[in-house]
Amino acid sequence: MSNQQSNSIPGWSLEERDPKFIESFMPIWEWFYRHYFRVRTDGWENVPTEDQVLVVGSHNGGMAVPDMIMMMYDWFRRYGTERLVYGLMHPHIWKINSDIAKLGEKTGAIAAHPKTANAALKRGASVLVYPGGQYDLFRPYNQRYNINF
């Protein structure tokens, strides 16, 4: 992915991520993580502490879509904000609500596309992906544990 290409398409730049911005939001995310959504995760002992990983999840929050940011909060509290991680976000967010998209970029969101994911991996970053996207958002509750590729 060329610099010209990454700068001309919203969500394609890996340069918008801001560790200081992330740190400033940690207390807010912690409250949502612990008290509102009451997130529980496990399996972190299987994540290498040094190497990059590809984390695959599924959306279960309906229109709220807290999954990605809560996962990123969990990542940051375990590994700090300096360990590179990017979350793939639906490219239409930049068209629908550019303000939310810009906030997402500061926390490490990039447009969901093979080229952006590949660029992040080449940089040595880990990547979070939710392959079911909008389909997972609106699936019936009894299918909440199914991941749609």
Residue ranges and their predicted role:
Residues 126-149:
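Membrane-associated lipid acylation/remodeling enzymes share a hydrophobic transmembrane-juxtamembrane segment
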Residues 106, 122, 130-131:
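Short glycine/serine/threonine-biased micro-segments
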Residues 49-50, 122-124:
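Short, well-ordered loop/turn elements at secondary-structure boundaries
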Residues 1-115:
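Membrane-anchoring hydrophobic helices of lipid-metabolizing enzymes
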Residues 116-122:
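Short amphipathic alpha-helices and their capping/turn segments at secondary-structure boundaries
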